[in-house]
């Protein structure tokens, strides 16, 4: 009986520790009450220095068999690389959960990758270029402080890059959090689990230079329906890891969703996007059914039909303008934003630690866990039910009390 109590207490103590660690021991932060839109005297154009001959197709999010089959993924890393090579992908990563695959580490186009997160609400991040896996995780539905704490830890390696994965899935990040959280470089706007266009505009409207990524998020390499559906197109002189991460951080690329009849070997491309005296000049390799310019708070700024070349004048009130391009066969291109700024140093402003709240919550958490351990010790030892501690009711002889007639 006592053994079973011990095992029960150990199990419950572990669960309670996870709760205390997540909701009381996690660092707490101060967040801006109002987001700041893009503004400044400079117009940043991520496509200012591109060469239309240097577009390379990339996929950074793919799962294979890992952790002895415990996670969702079929096929080996070698299978994944072989299939993406056959589809003319210049860069393709294996991003298993909390595991950096090194099968192709000797290749010139190898980029280290892993997906961080195994929590209930699918609040996941993709880490590219990291040398070690960050194991800090919060299992239960996460608070804003939990999410910021994880992003801070993932960003400690300044040579790596952090991407918010499928934010539209299960509301992994709320609208308010997208406005306030920092320390991520890109967003997986294009995913088979949802197009996070609204979420991207929330981030951009908060004045954060976060750039688009499109990925297959493939879990079964043998299923043709999961491969080659979405991609990131980067402008690269070479395909080594440093060049790939640099292009992603500068926004020198775009996301693409392939239509059902799209030839994967003949994709439409951006030829140029020039900015002169606030006027944007966009040229495509082929005619598009529609070209939409979208700005602050997701506002439609302008729309064009059946064109391959369009111009749009960027106003300061627009804050930013990004183009969404749709072709006749359903293929879509999502360009990165052109925006007003005062600097091209895109280091994000950190959310400062709220030291007072952090200390108070850690003290409360410590007291709660200490109280739990005291109760657990009492429970294991049977509480007050043992004979040695039982209160005995005294008895008195009959002569003690007078008789009443």
Which stretches of residues belong to each language-model region?
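Glycine-enriched alpha-helix->loop->beta-strand junction motifs that scaffold or abut catalytic
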Residues: 181-187, 207-211, 230-231
């Amino acid at each position: 009986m006592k053994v079973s109590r011990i095992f029960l207490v150990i199990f419950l103590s572990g669960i309670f520790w996870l709760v205390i660690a997540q909701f009381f021991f996690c660092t707490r932060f101060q967040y801006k009450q109002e987001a700041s839109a893009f503004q400044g005297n400079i117009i940043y154009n991520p496509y200012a220095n591109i060469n239309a001959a240097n577009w390379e197709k990339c996929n950074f999010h793919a799962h294979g068999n890992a952790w002895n089959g415990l996670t969702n993924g079929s096929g080996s890393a070698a299978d994944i690389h072989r299939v993406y090579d056959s589809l003319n992908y210049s860069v393709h990563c294996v991003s298993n959960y909390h595991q950096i695959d090194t099968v192709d580490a000797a290749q010139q186009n190898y980029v280290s990758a892993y997906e961080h997160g195994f929590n209930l609400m699918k609040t996941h991040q993709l880490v590219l270029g990291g040398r070690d896996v960050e194991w800090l995780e919060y299992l239960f539905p996460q608070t804003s402080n939990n999410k910021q704490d994880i992003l801070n830890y993932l960003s400690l390696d300044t040579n790596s890059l952090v991407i918010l994965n499928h934010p539209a899935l299960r509301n992994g990040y709320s609208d308010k959090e997208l406005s306030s959280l920092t320390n991520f470089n890109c967003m997986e706007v294009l995913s088979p689990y949802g197009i996070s266009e609204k979420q991207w505009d929330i981030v951009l409207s908060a004045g954060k230079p976060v750039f688009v990524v499109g990925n297959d998020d493939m879990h079964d390499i043998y299923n043709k329906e999961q491969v080659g559906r979405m991609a990131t197109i980067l402008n690269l002189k070479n395909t080594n890891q440093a060049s790939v991460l640099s292009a992603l951080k500068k926004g020198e690329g775009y996301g693409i969703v392939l239509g059902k009849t799209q030839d994967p070997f003949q994709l439409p491309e951006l030829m140029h996007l020039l900015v002169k005296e606030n006027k944007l000049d966009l040229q495509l390799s082929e005619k598009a059914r529609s070209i939409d310019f979208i700005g602050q708070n997701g506002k439609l700024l302008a729309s064009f039909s059946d064109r391959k070349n369009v111009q749009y004048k960027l106003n300061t009130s627009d804050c930013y303008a990004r183009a969404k391009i749709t072709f006749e066969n359903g293929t879509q291109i999502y360009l990165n934003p052109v925006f007003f700024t005062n600097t091209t140093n895109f280091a994000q402003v950190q959310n400062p630690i709220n030291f007072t709240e952090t200390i108070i919550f850690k003290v409360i958490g410590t007291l709660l866990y200490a109280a739990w351990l005291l109760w657990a010790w009492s429970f294991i030892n049977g509480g007050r039910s043992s004979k040695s501690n039982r209160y005995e009711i005294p008895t008195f002889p009959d002569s003690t009390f007078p008789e009443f007639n």
